[in-house]
Amino acid sequence: MKISTFLKASFLVVTLLLSNRGFSQDPNFYIFLCFGQSNMEGQGTVEAQDKKVNSRFQVLQSVNCSSLNRTKGKWYPAVPPLTRCWSGLSPADYFGRTMVENLPDSIRIGIINVSVAGCKIELYDKEGYTTYVASITETWLKNIIAEYNGNPYGYLVDMAKLAQKDGVIKGILLHQGESNTGDTQWPAKVKKIYNDLLNDLNLKSDSVPLLAGEVVHADQGGICASMNTIINRLPQSIPTSYVISSSKCTDANDNLHFNSAGYRELGKRYAKKMLQIMGYNGPLVGTEELMVAKDFSLEQNYPNPVSGETVIPFEIPTETFVSLKVFNNAGLEIKELAGKKYPAGKHTATFNARELLEGIYIYTLKTDDYTGSRKMIIEK
């Protein structure tokens, strides 16, 4: 009898161990939830430069897309579209690209995007969405909502729980407000949604911040730009929220949506803020400022990887003071390679890496009108 009981207990333990093998959460797989309306859904034209993506950046497919050969609930390389089958470029695209470009190679980034063009923030209210959905008259909007089983909030939570089996949720990205322009209760409504997400997914606000982007800015003629005043009040309601500026992010002819270049820049700004929240305050790769004069360039150093000396080429269109600094991956300055005026034209700077430890380093070129950074790999 004792032997039989022992065998049964042993069998139960082995069965439990085997059943748990399919659940393998990777702490180095950082997952970000994205939601909002059309600008987060993505309306930008996907161009050739957008179709090449680092394999460390992935998307959890939200809906079945035979046109993309993607199945709901599976991870894929994050080649746009990242939302639905026929959506376009969104801020999430260059958010993820910039994150993987600046984080260690051991870190992967995953995106879940459940966004609905034209919707009010009320669509994501856990309890109140039914009243809002019942008031909708536009067939196209009803059809989009139907793709998320009539409940985008619940759909996002279900997808997030699925993703939590694979990785760790590190943040929430929101871009919404055009359909709520003038609504002073918007910050309070967003706060409820944020708190509901934290509770339903067992998350803590101090480790899962909310990043909310401004709508098309007044400096681009944005027709909903007045909403940015309200959006910027969000941190007063949610201390762990951050507002991403849309100033100088270029837009489409409708002055409502960003164009592809605007989405790229806005996505990079989301990433820059997220990296800062994570404690990375050094120079960032792939976040060159928008106001770039013609013929400014910072090229890849050669050779790269490097063990001894390496050459860094750059070009400036006019005579100007140039700073060219090398930083370690923690953001500490290693050396200034320029620090003087240069005439217009092509130039090079030489850097001796013999005394440095192996790893990833960043070099940054700064002038009055340009900032650019690139990675350098040192191997011994």
What label would you give each PLM region?
Residues 25-284:
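Cell-envelope and extracellular/periplasmic
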Residues 289-302, 306-380:
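C-terminal outer-membrane/trafficking sorting elements
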Residues 4-5, 231, 380:
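Generic extreme N-terminus detector
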Residues 17, 25, 104, 165, ...:
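Generic structural signal for beta-strand residues in well-ordered domains
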Residues 7-10, 19, 224, 314, ...:
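Disordered, low-complexity tails and leader-like regions
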Residues 5, 18, 34, 371-372, ...:
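Short alpha-helical segments used as structural interaction elements across diverse proteins
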Residues 1-26, 287:
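Bacterial Sec-dependent N-terminal signal peptides
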